[in-house]
């Protein structure tokens, strides 16, 4: 898979591409990361990429032309194009699975007050990582890309994400423990130590449901609604 990041701050992506699993995936040629500074595609002599809002308003808007020209520089205009925006649909695990099937994805990260609305006509969809506002779209782009990349074959072992939160039944993951068995009065549940796999599996299923009900009751409500 090829992933393009259109941004005004290309250095933001250095730690993301140079460390851990993402770096290994790049090294093993499982993914190709391309960072594009769309400021370089401005026709303004000062490389200006923003301007005042028609009709008045706070802040400056990113112009459509530099972004459109940057997309023109990419193979197939960047494949499946995503505008990172707090106004977009909220990204989730199901969307990550869908996007992991594409050969090429492009994330467009904004700054300032946002984009000229016509930029939305250049992309396939707008995505958000939640109902809050950040200083720019770079962090959400990396969050979504990380979630997508780990689902690509051979990036991590299939077993590592097969039973994670939001997979399978859609519930959160069950609680897990390691040594020591007891710490400051906090003990590992006895059922996990008795070696009875049927009882352990039963406990895990019940614990998943309880944890999801406590932390994400909206998931339980959605599952019940879909039945």
Curated annotation (Swiss-Prot):
One GO cellular component, as annotated: cytosol
- Tell me, what's a Pfam family for it? tRNA_m1G_MT
Single GO molecular function: tRNA (guanine(37)-N1)-methyltransferase activity
Q: Which Gene3D superfamilies match?
A: 3.40.1280.10, tRNA(m1g37)methyltransferase, domain 2
Q: Where in the cell is it found?
A: Cytoplasm
Keyword Transmembrane helix in the entry? The reply is: no
InterPro entries the record matches: Alpha/beta_knot_MTases (IPR029028), tRNA_m1G_MeTrfase_C_sf (IPR023148), tRNA_m1G_MeTrfase_TrmD (IPR002649), tRNA_m1G_MTases_N (IPR029026), tRNA_MeTrfase_TRMD/TRM10 (IPR016009)
The record's catalysed reaction(s) read:
guanosine(37) in tRNA + S-adenosyl-L-methionine = N(1)-methylguanosine(37) in tRNA + S-adenosyl-L-homocysteine + H(+)
Q: Which domain of life is it from?
A: Bacteria
Instruction: Give UniProt keywords alphabetically.
Output: Cytoplasm, Methyltransferase, S-adenosyl-L-methionine, Transferase, tRNA processing
Q: At which positions is S-adenosyl-L-methionine bound?
A: 110, 129-134
Q: What is its EC number?
A: 2.1.1.228
Q: Which GO biological process categories is it annotated with? A: tRNA N1-guanine methylation
Coarse class of the primary localization is cytoplasm
Does the keyword field hold Cell wall biogenesis/degradation? no
PANTHER family from the UniProt entry: TRNA (GUANINE-N(1)-)-METHYLTRANSFERASE
Q: What subunit structure does UniProt give?
A: Homodimer.
Give the UniProt family note: Belongs to the RNA methyltransferase TrmD family.
Give the protein's biological function. Specifically methylates guanosine-37 in various tRNAs.
Name it. Answer: tRNA (guanine-N(1)-)-methyltransferase
**Where is the organism placed in the taxonomic lineage, from the top?**
Bacteria, Bacillati, Mycoplasmatota, Mycoplasmoidales, Metamycoplasmataceae
């Amino acid at each position: 898979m090829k992933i393009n990041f259109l941004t005004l701050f290309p250095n933001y992506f250095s730690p993301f591409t140079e460390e851990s699993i993402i770096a290994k995936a790049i090294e093993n040629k499982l993914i190709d990361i391309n960072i594009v500074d769309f400021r370089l595609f401005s026709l303004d002599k000062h490389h200006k990429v923003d301007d005042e809002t028609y009709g008045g308003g706070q802040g400056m808007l990113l112009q459509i032309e530099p972004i459109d020209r940057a997309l023109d520089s990419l193979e197939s205009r960047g494949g499946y194009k995503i505008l990172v925006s707090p106004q977009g649909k909220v990204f989730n695990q199901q969307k990550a699975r869908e996007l992991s099937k594409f050969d090429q994805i492009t994330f467009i990260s904004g700054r300032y007050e946002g984009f000229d609305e016509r930029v939305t006509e250049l992309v396939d969809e707008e995505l958000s990582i939640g109902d809050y506002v950040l200083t720019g779209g770079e962090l959400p782009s990396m969050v979504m890309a990380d979630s997508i990349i780990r689902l690509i074959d051979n990036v991590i072992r299939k077993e590592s994400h097969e039973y994670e939160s939001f997979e399978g039944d859609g519930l959160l993951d069950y609680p897990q423990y390691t040594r020591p068995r007891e710490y400051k009065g906090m003990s590992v549940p006895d059922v996990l130590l008795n070696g009875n796999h049927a009882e352990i599996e039963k406990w895990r299923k019940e614990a998943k449901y309880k944890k999801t009900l406590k932390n994400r009751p909206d998931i339980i409500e959605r599952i019940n609604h879909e039945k």
